[in-house]
Each structure stands twice: as structure tokens, then as C-alpha cells.
Amino acid sequence: MAPNTAVEVQSVGGIPTAVAGPDVHRDITVKWFLLGAVGYFLIVGIVALIIAAKFVWPDFLGSIQYFTYGRMRPLHVNGMLFGWLLGADMGLAYYIVPRLCGVRLWSEKLGVATSILWNIIILSAVVTLLGGYQKGLEYADLPTPVAILVVIAWVMFGVNIFATIATRKYKQMYVSTWYLMGTILWTAFVYLTGNFATLLTTGVNQANLNWMYTHNAVGLIFTPAGLAVGYYFIPRASNTPLYNHKLSMIGFWSLAFVYVWTGAHHMLHGPISQWLQTNLDRLFGHVADPGLGGGLQLHRHHERPVASVQRQRLAQVPDVGNGVLSAHVLSGSDAQPALGERDRLQDRLDSRARAHGGDGHLLIHCHGRRVLCDSANL
């Protein structure tokens, strides 16, 4: 088959979903989100400098009501959360998931529409927060109408990502896909709690819900998204296999079941239920599990030596673009694996080879041996 010949890709259910070829991933949505995120990071960084200057010169821009500290700080916090961090995470999810699934993004138009709505949300936040319209809750300052727009945008994002995963070419899912799915589900729960449930109560209960939201905004939104990005790009950039996929999944489930309880540490020894403080004490030590597991993964896979001949082959084997996956055992000889071995190898590629995604070549472990795999447009 010619290198640039397009091949129809079938979904899990046998439904044609994409054409595997040089231009299988258009990445229009990715560019919109990432460019916007970088732009907001620079702008909000300037806001941070103005806020810092106010600590030294309290009267700096103090005569302008829109630039008072009480309005600038919520703008900085929410700008970094939604404009920079969450916008960048969404853009990277649009990049990673189609490549790990071997198909195009389910709907590029829906992705672009989500990006447009996201920018409308950021601009609305700027106008309302500087205008003094806010709820006065940490991380949940946005007025309710703007918060509703965030929910709508997140539903659009989640539908696009989950639909892409549902039409994936590969049955098994790499850990980055798990973390991104978790991010979508956990964000929905955390955001609804912090921005809407807090409005239904007052006093200590409201404070408890608010700190649950602020803490888990870091641990159940940005942490899993960051781990997904690291698990994808670090093995791919270093061209070495993931150390242990099961270990990464232990970290995933630890994050899922443990982290949500630890938000109460913001009110430790305060007027909250004793049982909540007790659970916090017992579970807090396990918060480090996902980070330690990820750190061990990304450290240990660098310790695996790759023979110089393997490195030379990695550099010399040309890219292929025909959508066909082939394998060559890198041993002392050039012997090819038997046909049955190739079939078993291809069945085992989905969970680990997807770590490197993209076109090029994948270095993985199979049956205790290093294997070089040609992979096109995955």
C-alpha cells in the first residue's frame, strides 16, 4: 500500500468514523483553545503584576473603581482558572484523545463552537467581575448566568470527547484517556457543587461546600488533566515505553476515591463535623499516591537502557503513512516474529503503544522484549 493511501477506520461498533491518512487530525479546535489560553495567560499575568504593585503602592490605580483590589483579584483567579488552565487542558484533550483513539475528533464544528462560547464566557467574566458583579465565594465568583454558560460549554466539550472515545479504533484505553474522562466527570460534579449547591445553604455548611470546591478544583480538575498530559507527552518525547500501565491505573483510582474527601483540611479544627475531620486525617496520606505513581512511572522508564543499535534504528526507520501497524523485534538479529506472534503483539499494542501517539515509531515492551513498531496517524 502506498505510504499516503487513506484507509477507512472502523469504530468499535463497526461504524466508519474517520479516514486514516496524513491529514487525519485537523486540530482546528486545538489551535483555537491553545492560542486563546496562551493569550489569556499573558493578559492575566499583567493583572497579577498590577495586584502585586498594590501591595507596595496601595493607592496605585486606586482612584479607578474597576482596578480596585477587590475586583482585580477575582479577575486574576478566575482568569487563570478558566482562561489559562482549563482552556489549555481542553485544547490538549482535543489533541490527545483523537490520537489515542485512532480516529478524528467526533465533531470539529462542535469543538470550534465550544471554543467560541468559552471565549464569550471569559469576556463576560471580565465585564462582570470588574463591574463588581460577583458571588463573593472563593473560585466561585462568577455570577450565576455566566456559571450556567460554563456548564453548557462543559457539556459540549464532554459530548465531543466521549463521542470520540465511543468511536475509537482501539478497545483498550491508555491511562491518559482514563484521566481525561475522569476530569470531565469530576469537573461536572465539583463545579455544580461549588457554584450552585453553595447558594442553597449558608454558614458553616456553605463554607464547607465552598472549600470542597476550591480544593477539588485543583485535585479533581487540574491534577488529572495535568497527569493525562504528562503520561502522553513525556513517554512520546523521550521515545521510551511507559514503565507500568497498571501502576498508573492505581494512581487514577486512588485519585478518584481519596481526593474528594480532603477538601475539609481548609477547615480542620474548625466548626465542621468530627467524622469529616477523622476521614480527612485517615485519607490525606493517600493524596500523594497519584503523584508518586506518576513520578515513579516517568522516572523509571528513563532508566531502561536502549542499545545504541536500537537508537540508530529509531532514527533511521522512515515514517509510514499507510495506517498499517507492523512490528520488528529489536534483538541481536534481524529475525521477524512469527505470524501468530505478530497477531498477539498487535492485540497488546493498544494499551501501551498509544503512549506515544502520532505518526512515527513506537518503542514498547511485549513478552519481555523491546519492540519497534511503525505507527501512522494514530
Which sequence ranges carry the predicted segments?
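Hydrophobic cores of alpha-helical transmembrane segments in multi-pass integral membrane proteins
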Residues: V30-V56, Y69-V103, E108-G132, T144-T164, ...
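Extramembrane terminal tails and long inter-domain/linker segments of multi-pass membrane proteins
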Residues: M1-V30, L61-I64, H301-S308
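Helix-boundary and loop/linker segments of multi-pass membrane transporters
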Residues: R26, R71-R73, A307-Q310, L349
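Alpha-helical transmembrane segments
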Residues: H299-R311, L345-Q346, C373-L378
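N-terminal juxtamembrane segment and adjoining first transmembrane helix
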Residues: V19-L35, T167-V175
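Hydrophobic, small-residue-rich membrane helices and short re-entrant helix-turn-helix hairpins
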Residues: K169-Y174, Q206-N210, A237-S248, W275-L276, ...
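Non-cytosolic membrane-interface motifs at loop->transmembrane helix junctions
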Residues: G136-A147, Q172-S176, N205-Y213, I272-L283, ...
